[in-house]
Design a protein with these regions (language model features):
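Short, contiguous, well-ordered secondary-structure segments
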Residues: 49-74, 83, 92-97, 101
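Periplasmic OmpA-like peptidoglycan-binding domain that tethers envelope proteins to the cell wall
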Residues: 74-142
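Sec-dependent bacterial lipoprotein signal peptides
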Residues: 1-18
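Generic structural signal for beta-strand residues in well-ordered domains
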Residues: 11, 30, 62, 102-104, ...
Length: 142
């Protein structure tokens, strides 16, 4: 099984565990608010601003080694469905790689792609597309 399949499987397992513990899983929806990572069009590279956001997340994860997160990668709607899903995964993988390089245990992190299925805005404009090109870190609780 390749890494992408394992990551997706891990995320599904975390989400299914959430279904059984609905009262505590509201935290699954908790996002590092104001700390989303944005990407350039059709790119998965992290810029300095994104790295600063991820440094904060890495510090928190290292201080809370019992906590797990899911990194969700997204794309704007301009590509094909397959391309956007692949790009979303590359973005999630880039975030995970940076967090791991920063000292976070890789077992704390699952990755998944949403592609362009959950847009940040309904604006079909350059500004809206910028908001769609993101990766979010969601905290999972047990």
């Amino acid at each position: 099984m390749n890494k992408k399949m394992l990551g997706a499987l891990g995320a599904l397992m975390m989400m299914s565990a959430c279904a059984h513990h609905a009262t505590t899983c509201e935290n699954f929806k908790q996002v590092f608010k104001q700390e989303q990572v944005l990407f350039s069009s059709n790119r998965a590279e992290l810029d300095a601003e994104s790295k600063a956001v991820l440094d904060h997340q890495a510090d928190w994860l290292k201080k809370n080694p019992h906590r797990k997160v899911v990194i969700q990668g997204y794309a704007d709607p301009r590509g094909t469905e397959a391309h956007n899903m692949n790009l979303g995964m590359k973005r999630a993988d880039a975030v995970k790689a940076y967090l791991v390089k920063s000292g976070v245990n890789p077992d704390q992190i699952a990755v998944t792609s949403k592609g362009a299925t959950e847009l940040a805005t309904t604006q079909n404009t350059a500004q809206g597309w910028t908001a769609d090109r993101r990766a979010l870190t969601l905290i999972v609780t047990e």
